[in-house]
Structure formats: structure tokens, C-alpha cells
Regions:
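Short, glycine-biased loop/turn motifs at secondary-structure junctions and
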Residues: 1-164
């Protein structure tokens, strides 16, 4: 693979790391810094060529994966695909709603369903209409607020129990 200046870039040797890095080093890059490198851009975790919505999602995911091996295995294949992913504002708004919808109707319910006292909230979230615009988000707000409040209460109760 080559960057925009024709320099050869070998992604095989890259191990993705958590956090931001002050300089470009093939042995210490996060996923979005690798995208900037492949694109031939200055060192940054906010490459101009990449969709900012996808970039925000991937920076968070990059830093939440607990091992370099898992991070590299999951995220490195995405690096070449992210170069040139920046699009119009309308496309980026659509992508932001897709991410929000996934978070509210898939990700959160997966975790809530692990606790018997939160399963009803998981079911309610999964039953929401797709979150595609401000109107659909407003219609879902009561259900989202209830799930958040219940999860927060469960978290505080668990912390209190752990503290003794």
C-alpha cells in the first residue's frame, strides 16, 4: 500500500495502540493516526480525509479495546477503507443517526439484558422505532431516559454494595 505521496506503507507490521501519540511511529499509532499516515496527511488522530462521525466512533472504540492484539485484529482492516470516507454534511448526519440508533437499540440493550432487573429496559429499547432524525429521537426520549435512570440506579447500588 502507498500513501498519497507514493511512499510504501506496510500495514502488516503495525500494532494499534490505545491513546493519542505525539509523533508518528509505526509501533505506536491509534487507528485514526494510521488512517492519516496511509492518506499521506500530517500526524493526527483527526485526519481530514476521514468522516468525523466514523472517526469519533473509532477513537472511542480504539481506546476501549483492552489489548493491542484485539485492537489490531479488529481495527487495522478498516484503515484503508477510512481513507476518503469524508462525505457531505447530509451523509455525515445520516451516519451519526446510524451510530446513535445502534447505540440505543443494539449496544445498550445487549448490556442491560445481562441483569434481570434491567431486562425490561433492554426489551423496550430494542422495540424502539429506528432513530433516524430529531423527531424519532424525541419520540424515544422517555424510553431512553427510563433506561438510563434504571442503569444509573443499578450502577450506584452495585458500587454501594461493593464499598460495603
Amino acid at each position: 500500500m502507498s500513501d498519497s505521496q507514493g511512499n510504501t506503507i506496510n500495514l502488516d507490521g503495525i500494532v494499534l495502540k490505545a491513546g493519542g501519540h505525539t509523533k508518528r511511529d509505526a509501533e505506536a499509532l491509534c487507528v485514526m493516526e494510521a488512517v492519516a499516515w496511509v492518506a499521506g496527511e500530517p500526524h493526527s488522530d483527526h485526519p481530514v480525509c476521514a468522516c468525523p462521525v466514523i472517526g469519533a466512533f473509532l477513537r472511542q472504540w480504539n481506546d476501549s479495546i483492552s489489548t493491542d492484539e484485539a485492537r489490531t485484529r479488529l481495527l487495522k482492516p478498516l484503515v484503508p477503507r477510512l481513507v476518503g470516507s469524508k462525505s457531505t454534511e447530509a451523509v455525515e448526519v445520516r451516519r451519526s443517526y446510524l451510530a446513535l440508533d445502534w447505540l440505543a437499540r443494539e449496544y445498550a440493550p445487549a448490556w442491560l439484558s445481562l441483569r434481570n432487573d434491567l431486562k425490561a429496559h433492554a426489551v423496550a429499547l430494542r422495540g424502539l422505532a429506528p432513530l433516524t432524525d430529531t423527531a424519532s429521537c424525541a419520540a424515544a426520549q422517555t424510553t431512553l431516559d427510563a433506561a438510563l435512570a434504571a442503569a444509573g440506579a443499578a450502577s450506584r447500588a452495585a458500587a454501594g454494595a461493593a464499598a460495603g
